[in-house]
C-alpha cells in the first residue's frame, strides 16, 4: 500500500493496481475500495459510501451488483462476504457481447434482442399486455441503407414514433403523439427552425450570430410572433445581455474581473442580483438583490459550508436587516441530509438505511414521526405515521409507482410503454397526459367524470417550457395562448 495527502484528504493506494484503496476526507470519513487480480473494482464501502459488491465475467463485463438495505445497522466494513444484499444481474450474448437481459432483485426485468447488425430490435419489459402473459414490447426499425432509426412501435396503445432524415442523416421530421414536427437546417447543418403541426401548431426559429453562437429564438403562434429573445456576448465569448420582445432594457450579465465567474445580473426593472463567492472554492456565500434607493435588500441569502463543500447554513432576508429564516443543515457520514434546523418551524430530521432509503423522518415542530419500509427494489411499500393515516405505495412490474399520495389525496397511476405517467385516477376525477418524442409532456387534461374541466398544452425550447395554451375549447377554436416563460440561458 502507498499513501499520499492531497489537500485535506488522505489517499491510500493499492500497490498492485495503483488505484485508490481508502480515501479519508477532511472530516475523517472513509471511502474504501477492493479490487480483484485483474484490477476490477469488486467492492466499495466505508463510512462515506453506500456499500456495494460487483462481479464480472471473463470478458470484464459487469454481471451483478449487490446493494444493502439492512436498516438499523451501518455497514462500514468490506461487504463481500455478506449474503443479505439485493442483487441486480446482467446477461450477455456470448458471441456478440451484447446485453440480453437485466434482472432485478425481485426476478423481474427487461430483455433485449438485436438484428443482424447488432442494433436493438425489441425490448421486452416485465409488464404484460394480455391474459396470456405476453410481455409489453417495443420494436425498433431502421433504414436498410443508412441504418437510421425510423420507427419505434409498441404492442399496446402507446403512440408510435416515426423519424425522417435528409441525405446528410440529419433528422428532418418526427411524427409522435403531439403531431408532426419538421426541422430545418442552415448551410452549416445547424438547427434553424422547428415547425409543429398538431396539438400545439407553432414554429420555433433559432437565431445565431456571425460566429454560429445561439443568439436567441422567436416563437410563432397563431397570427404572429408571441415571444422573441435576443442574446449578445462580450469579448470573452460570455453571455452579456438577454432581451425579450425587442425591449429597450435587457437583462445584463456582469463577471468577476479576476475569476471570470458570473457576479451580477441586472434586471430591466433596475433590480440587481449580486453573487459573492468563497475565494478558493468559488462556492456561493451570498446572493444579494439590490434596488436603488432601498434601505434594506429586497431579498438576500447567505450561505456557509463545511470542509466538504456541503451547505451548513442558509439565511434568508426579506427586506429586513436581520434574517427572516435560518436553516442549519447537518449530515451523516455519507453526506445524506440528517437534519434541517430552522429558526421557525422546528427541525426536519431524517434517518436512512445503507442504500439511502429513508427509515424515519420528522418534518417540523409538532409533526408526527414517519417510518418507511422499503423492499428489495428500494421502493417504499409502507409509510407509517404516528398520527394520521398511513400510506402503502404500490408499483407495477417495471417499477413505476402506481399508487401515489399528494395533498389532494391518493391517486392510481398507469404508465405507457415508455414508462411515462399517462393517467391519474381518483374516484371520478381523471388526469390524462400526452408526451412527445423527447418525453416532454405536451398535454394535460383534467376530467370530472366525462366532463372536461381543463386542458392545457405546452410548447418547449429544448427541455424548457416556454408557452402554455388553453385547449379546453379546441372543438370550436384553436388553443388560446395563456402564458409564456423566459428562462435564464445560464441556468
Q: For the regions a protein language model found, what residue spans apply to each?
A:
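Short, small/polar residue-rich loop motifs at catalytic or cofactor-binding pockets
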Residues: 27-29, 48-50, 85-86, 106-108, ...
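Single conserved hydrophobic/aromatic residue that forms the stacking wall/gate
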Residues: 1-14
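Beta-strand-dense domains in secreted/periplasmic systems and polymorphic toxin scaffolds
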Residues: 8, 23, 33, 41-45, ...
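Surface-exposed extracellular loop regions of Gram-negative outer-membrane beta-barrel proteins
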Residues: 34, 321-339, 394-434
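Short, ordered secondary-structure scaffold segments
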Residues: 18-20, 34-35, 97, 162-165, ...
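A residue-level detector for well-ordered beta-strand positions
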Residues: 13, 22, 33, 54, ...
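Intrinsically disordered, low-complexity Ser/Thr- and acidic-rich flexible linkers and loops
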Residues: 70-85, 127-135, 294-295, 321-322, ...
